[in-house]
């Protein structure tokens, strides 16, 4: 699947170079310097709306972060058989973080371990048309990323994949 190839590329690039990855459909509400500014954090990402996966449209990391080796290897092993679950890699990422931190579920905030300090934001989606100034997305949702209850990022433009764009 194309999305899974993009996941693999994203993981490889972030492992090698580090940096901040934002999906093209991401709109920052807060300044980027106020979002990724926590001390001693080497991985930022987002708990998806279902609370069972990682929203991979936002990932920030230091170069050579060892969690990405595990994520890359998981993709390479998994693609040897047909993949029926579109969210297989986002769920694996979530479960890997749970395993590292010895948690039953992940929550918004800072998590510290011997080799990995992570900060997690929350994705929250509603079906309320008034929550998004540009309307609901193609799935009928309005989704934002929150940090401790504060909206910091809007995700999923209502018109993505930009209907009406010339081909």
Each model region followed by its residue ranges:
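Small-residue hinge/turn detector
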Residues: 7-19
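Glycosyltransferase-associated regions of secretory-pathway enzymes
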Residues: 1-6, 22-167
């Amino acid at each position: 699947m194309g999305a899974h190839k993009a996941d693999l590329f994203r993981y490889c690039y972030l492992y090698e170079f580090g940096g901040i990855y934002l999906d093209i459909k991401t709109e920052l509400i807060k300044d980027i310097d106020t979002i990724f500014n926590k001390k001693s954090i080497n991985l930022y990402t987002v708990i998806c709306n279902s609370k069972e996966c990682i929203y991979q449209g936002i990932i920030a990391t230091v170069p050579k972060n060892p969690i990405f080796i595990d994520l890359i290897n998981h993709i390479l092993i998994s693609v040897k058989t047909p993949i029926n679950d579109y969210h297989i890699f986002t769920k694996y990422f979530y479960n890997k973080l749970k395993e590292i931190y010895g948690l039953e579920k992940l929550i918004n905030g800072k998590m510290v371990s011997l080799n990995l300090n992570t900060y997690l934001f929350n994705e929250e989606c509603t079906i309320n048309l008034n929550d998004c100034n540009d309307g609901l997305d193609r799935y009928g949702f309005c989704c934002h990323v929150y940090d401790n209850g504060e909206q910091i990022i809007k995700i999923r433009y209502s018109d993505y994949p930009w209907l009406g764009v010339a081909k």
